[in-house]
Amino acid sequence: MKFVFEARMKPGYSVDEYAQEWIRASEIIQQSPGALGTYLHRKIGAPDTVMAIAHWESKGHRDAKDDHRNSIVHAILEKHAQKCEITVIGEFEEAEWIVLPQF
């Protein structure tokens, strides 16, 4: 499954600052059972906005992780809650329909 959210930086906080903290938290979160990686994308035309896509074995695995178990992750998420506007886009199943280029 995919968990997708957008983060828009408030004035005075940069995407690069966000990304540094996001990487620190993500490295810890990725130690959780069922974690399959996470990606951070810059939004074209909006230099203060990124989209994160976290990959999990299942919704159950994602729901079972506990961000409060680690003080570093908890502190980073609290900081992001103050410095960014976070919009959850949603939780998505793995793709049912895939078209890839044929070479």
Question: Could you say what each language-model-derived stretch is?
Answer:
Residues 8-20:
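Short, surface-exposed ligand-recognition loops at beta-strand->loop->(often short) alpha-helix junctions
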Residues 2-9, 38-70:
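Short, well-ordered beta-strand segments in beta-rich or mixed alpha/beta enzyme
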Residues 6, 92-94:
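Short amphipathic
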Residues 24-36, 55-91:
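An amphipathic, aromatic/His-enriched active-site/gating alpha helix that lines ligand/cofactor pockets
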Residues 94-103:
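Short, low-order "capping/linker" segments at domain edges
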Residues 14-15, 49, 88-92:
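Intrinsically disordered, low-complexity regions enriched in Ser/Pro/Gly/Gln/His and often acidic
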